Design a protein with these regions (language model features):
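Short beta-strand/loop segment at the start of cytosolic alpha/beta domains
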Residues: 1-18, 23
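Short acidic-hydrophobic, aromatic-tinged amphipathic segments that line or gate anion-handling sites
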Residues: 117-121
Length: 131
């Protein structure tokens, strides 16, 4: 996991997980444990920076799905669904940045980009969280 994850905290608001290497069955649980640990310490907003991620497997996609569920308030999602009739809920709490083309392709074809906002780079993604 040490090779996969580096954590940066933006003062007062967003935690950035910088991923590198492979997100697969060997690393997914460690990533989820890091999310749990940061959430317990008060993390509310998470940006996953993917620039150095080389590969994501189905286990890695499962980890992203679990992270989305962990960081998206259920009541907010339910209210969105009632109000927006079939439009997908986009997380305000969990976002992605800097995905290489091969990772972007997998995320898109698997349907993740319907619910998780993605940005071309970290500064743009950070700005999307607002103040």
């Amino acid at each position: 996991m040490a090779d996969l994850l580096t954590i940066t905290k933006v003062p007062g608001r967003v935690t950035i997980f910088h991923l590198a290497g492979k997100l697969d069955g060997q690393t997914n649980e460690s990533l989820l444990e890091a999310v749990r640990k940061e959430q317990a310490a008060g993390m509310r907003f998470l940006l996953l920076e993917l620039q150095a991620l080389e590969m994501i497997t189905s286990a890695g996609l499962g980890a992203l799905h679990n992270m989305f569920k962990m960081l998206s308030p259920k009541a907010e999602m339910e209210a969105w669904e009632k109000e927006h009739h079939g439009e997908p809920y986009k997380s305000a709490y969990f976002k992605l940045a800097g995905a290489p083309p091969n990772i972007y392709y997998v995320l898109n074809i698997a349907g993740f980009l319907s619910n998780i906002p993605i940005y071309p780079d970290t500064p743009t993604a950070l700005a999307s969280f607002g103040d």
